[in-house]
Amino acid sequence: MISKIITSIFGSSNDRTLKRLRKRVAQINKLEPAFEKLTDEELQAKTAEFKQRLADGASLDSLLHEAFATVREASRRVMGMRHFDVQLIGGMVLTNRNIAEMRTGEGKTLTATLPCYLNALTGKGVHVVTVNDYLARRDAETNRPLFEFLGLSVAVNVPGLPNEVKREAYKADITYSTNSELGFDYLRDNLAHAKEDRFQRELHYALVDEVDSILIDEARTPLIISGPAEDATQIYQAIDTIIPHLVQQDKEDTEEYTGEGDFTLDLKNKQAHLTERGMVKVEGILTEMGLMQEGETLYHPVRIALLHHVYAALRAHKLFELNVDYIVKDGEVVIIDEHTGRTMAGRRWSDGLHQAIEAKEKVNIQGENQTVASITYQNYFRLYEKLAGMTGTADTEAFEFQQIYGLDTIVIPTNKPVIRDDRTDLMFKSEPEKFAAIIKDIQECMARQQPVLVGTASVEKSELLSAELTKAGIAHNVLNAKFHAQEAEIVAEAGAPGAVTIATNMAGRGTDIVLGGNWKAEIAKLENPTEEQIEAIKAAWKERYDIVMKAGGLHIIGTERHESRRIDNQLRGRSGRQGDPGSSRFYLSLDDALMRIYLNEGKLNMMRKAFSEEGEAMESKLLTKVIASAQAKVEAHNFDGRKNLLQYDDVANEQRKAIYEQRNYLLETEDISAMIETIRGDVFNRVIDQFIPPQSIEEMWDVAGLEEALKRQFGMELPIQHWLEQENDLHEETLRERIIDIATQEYHAKEEKVGSEVMRNFEKGVMLQNLDELWKEHLSAMDYLRKGIHLRGYAQKDPKQEYKKESFEMFTNMLDLLKSNVISVLSRIQVRSQEEIEEAQRQQETMAQAESENYRTADHQAEAQQSESLTEEQLANLDIGRNDPCPCGSGKKYKHCHGSKARYA
């Protein structure tokens, strides 16, 4: 209450920011008349002028007014579009570490040209990040003429590009790319074995389009590059047959309650748990299958992997649904993004879940993979020196953007007031009643030729509603994961009079729905259209536009509330763009997932009793509060999950940074011999310490053990016992120095044989190979630690602190092992000089020649003996198989000896 009073007096933080930025807009507008008078050449020369001023010490902020005026005037000349004042405000917000909330249709693509141009002047590169390939290509081609007019290069980076093309794309001033490709390229760069193989420059400025989708919805999805692991295909198939025999139980067993079922489900967290009864049942079936021994349990250390497979199969069957969480396409299981409704080709669930679903759907089971490199979007985008984002819906997540990314959210006012009619929700008792009401609403819209966009939460629901519309004889388009390729075409037609379009979540997001249909898309379909054709298309569109405007603009129907208010707002935001009319309404039922999972049974029963007759709709403020309460619970739960993930990933992130910095140092540095010398001293000292403790007396020494260790690990045979017997003044320190000196001398002797350049390259190769292999194993070990660390809570220990402590110990152990492995390989390697190699080659050639002469001599002798012992006539009379030994005694098969002669005869 007090905060509202203060806000009403002083204005909100957002209002104060906008007030300050409007003053700067006035400064930019003052420059406009002067910039309009510039010739094209003078306007283009501004880019070089700005770059020189930056080089002379000017700041980007000091150039902002002139730079924005330059872009606005260039855009007017090249693209026929002049930036509105609110777009200038958006551009200023995006220049710094902020998120701009701009409503759908307010021109985010054009707004982005302002901060992109300004930040590209530094020459460090700008990355414009989009959610899919189509938008990356579209936005790049849309803005390319403007940027190239101003002397900046533009490139697109999408999956499947040849390495050289990708490398050039990153050298461009402005690179349009998808979020996943940027992350994967970063990981690939940190797996490269030569600096020339890397793609990215230093990460300078990223402008993320649909920032909420990328930094929040996909925040929990790690980017993973993996390699093949142990194959367990047959186990997945065997365990898949067990699940149909198991019975679900409503709630967990307790001291007071023991159920009759085999497993319970946690729908909120998508987890499954075996009951005590279920555990015994599964163990019995596995024993019958021969996968376990009689008397063994699933918690036996040897069998714990089987339990992992059982839980993966349970989740696959009971918690992941076809056409909701995934589709089967061309014999492969393809994940559906729960937030966008789009398929995520190439992505796979981890922990054996994907293989379990493949077994369930009876498709080819692909092998499990081991993580080679991974990073979350949260940590990848925090690597950029400057990060900004834009979206139509960010204000509801402003707290999370600030907490996790340090980004402030500024709501940009619309150019024209929003006049969309957002109607109150209608609640129905069951889903069939809800669908009947939706169909009635659609029919009413079609009668007045008003276009309708129907938003659904899953592919399954979109197909179910599509079937109902088909039954009712209503023509419509479906936009979901199965029809991803037709996305742009379907969206282009969605604003036509009487058009009905069903879309999952925010499929089609990023593409405006133009009232009356998209006339530009119609023209694009024609080859070399004439002026008459273009004018005819525009005239036809104007007629359709007028019809739609009269009917009330685009009508949005939500078939259920989403887990987040933000996604509901995104759906609503498709209508009422740029001051157009429009309307929206959500239709709900007590069967909806949000109601079932997040409202308790008592509230649901109370609401069921409120319905007196079939088909009755309920709308009230209480209903709105109940729904808002459920969504708030989900948002809080999801935020906690993302924050928790980040806290754990931050531990791994510090280690990742250290490893990747070391890796980049190795790639950039030509000579690492000084590092090798230091490591050699550390490794030998550590080995010697095990057998001869520092400052210890001779009776405590294990000399034989030290001799054996040096031989085994470094290939060094040293008579240490003999030295000690012969030299009375040899003590612990001098002995240590002698061993390390001999190791160093032997290594330098090898270097003299092959040359320093060869040895330097070999050192780098050994270091990189061992670093990559051990890092891969470390990631796997960290993953195992992460999965089980929550159990420390039962011992009254903080799991996060325990994870930090143990992961640090694992990391230091890995580094120690890396040093040992590298020195061991370098010490044991046998090298030969060029003269020795040439001599060895000469000896091999001589031996080969001698062997060849011996074979020829032996053949001649054998033939002579054969001709003496058996005549051709005698051999021809014998009944000999072609593969039998020749009776002449040569030892060859008959077909290769006298058999061949007989055949030719």
From Swiss-Prot:
Binding site for ATP: Q87, G105, E106, G107, K108, T109, D512
SMART domains hit by this protein: SecA_DEAD, SecA_PP_bind
Subcellular location(s) of the protein: Cell inner membrane; Cytoplasm
Annotated binding of Zn(2+), by residue: C886, C888, C897, H898
Cofactor note: May bind 1 zinc ion per subunit.
Cofactor: Zn(2+)
One MF term in the entry's GO annotations: protein-exporting ATPase activity
Location of region: Disordered: 840-905
GO cellular component: a single term: plasma membrane
Main location: membrane
GO biological process: intracellular protein transmembrane transport; protein import; protein targeting; protein transport by the Sec complex
Catalytic activity: ATP + H2O + cellular proteinSide 1 = ADP + phosphate + cellular proteinSide 2
Sequence ranges of Basic and acidic residues compositional bias: 853-862
Reported function: Part of the Sec protein translocase complex. Interacts with the SecYEG preprotein conducting channel. Has a central role in coupling the hydrolysis of ATP to the transfer of proteins into and across the cell membrane, serving both as a receptor for the preprotein-SecB complex and as an ATP-driven molecular motor driving the stepwise translocation of polypeptide chains across the membrane.
Family the UniProt entry places it in: Belongs to the SecA family.
Protein name: Protein translocase subunit SecA
